[in-house]
Amino acid sequence: DSHRRQRQMCIRDRTSTLQQAASSKLGFGVSRTMRVAQKLYEAGRITYMRTDAPSLSNDSIEDARLFIKDTLAEEYLTEKPRIYSGKENAQEAHEAIRPTSASLTPEKLSGHSEEEVKLYDLIWRQFIACQMPDAKYLSINAKVVLDDYVFSARGREVIFDGYTKISSQNAKKADEENLPSLEEGQVLKLVEVKNEKKFTKPPARFSEAALVKE
């Protein structure tokens, strides 16, 4: 059983979403994220880091699109520029948090601490990915019959990686695995059987990222 799906890039970086991403992906607390972002801003590497706006300037959008076209391929560029707008009452004196130059990749960032490079990498990838197309894949639910036993597997087959080529955001759910192409009635070779004991877990405690989201 399979069906096609698309996964979209999430909205551009605002202060709250940057704090959430830095907490979940880098283990940074809110105050640490803002301290590191302040250093990047003062060094002229990123735009102002206190903003409610997901919007981007036309020049920055063109900058990202030129980078994608020159360094990746035409297929990784959306047909039209993606424009992001904020909520009606959002404070949009500043645009979304982004690098000041798309061509300044994390690998080229010099004279900065490890934590600054890590946060910059997060911001840069989010910025570039926002002008890339959706990821496309087949969602697969497979049942494998072995004698009197039926084994189930849930996963996906990637058709086109899209924005996930540069950003792992929303690339795969925790219970999904990349599966090879399968056909109904196909004979498979048993390689290994593992018996694993698993337990359900209580809801996780609130992290700083979860509190910011709330």
Which residue ranges define each predicted feature?
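Long, charged, helix-prone linker segments
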Residues: 137-155
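Extended, highly charged linker/hinge segments and catalytic-adjacent loops that couple domains
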Residues: 43-121, 152-195
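Short acidic, hydrophobic short linear motifs in intrinsically disordered regions
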Residues: 12-22, 47-51, 202-214
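TRNA-recognition modules of translation machinery and tRNA-sensing kinases, especially anticodon-binding
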Residues: 118-125, 139
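Active-site phosphate-binding and catalytic loops of NTP-dependent enzymes
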Residues: 30, 74-81, 128-136
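Alpha-helix C-terminal capping/helix-coil junction sites
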Residues: 23, 41-42
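Single conserved hydrophobic/aromatic residue that forms the stacking wall/gate
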Residues: 1-11
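Short amphipathic alpha-helical interaction segments
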Residues: 28-39
